């Protein structure tokens, strides 16, 4: 029945986009235009401390950028990789510094800087090593949080929605207009898949929740064809509307929990 519900409502995904979760996360370009007031920063910190989904969303954005940086560096696209390696340090991590302190965590600023420097240097052995250390450090910050299936779906909805916005900027009429945004979107879907697979391994999930997670995993895997390569040279015959629809489908899936 859940599968049927998913298939029936998938076609109205774009219409339901307006119902998707509002995201004020660091992936939005608006935050680069309007400097945050002290009160806004204080509210943001309270949100990240009290809302597990918002906290995990920020960490997931970082993980997405880092995954792309690692992939690009391993295939020789060091200039592209360096941009993604620096992005979390420059634009996202600062939101989390005080949150980590409040949670009693050391964070991963040193590891983030080391990985970024390794990417710039082009030393593949150092890149591999520093990436593993960095991912392990990020995982320590994630391990404090255990999401319910409903919270996971909300998080995945946010990640797909952000990927859709980035893809819409990156690919216009089948042509690459901003390869960096296109690459960002791929990283966010990768982390969404990773989170979904990890959640599926929980031993206490009900049959209903396992069915929902299975459908979610299949949907995410189906999206991967939208990135035939991380640095496309020709046409990319896909459109962001597919991602917007996938985000809406996740909302519909959550109704069956």
What is the role of each PLM region?
Residues 10-14:
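Hydrophobic helical h-region of N-terminal Sec-dependent signal peptides
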Residues 16-19:
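C-terminal motif of bacterial Sec signal peptides marking the signal peptidase cleavage site
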Residues 24-257:
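Mature extracytoplasmic or organellar-lumen-exposed domains after removal of signal/transit peptides
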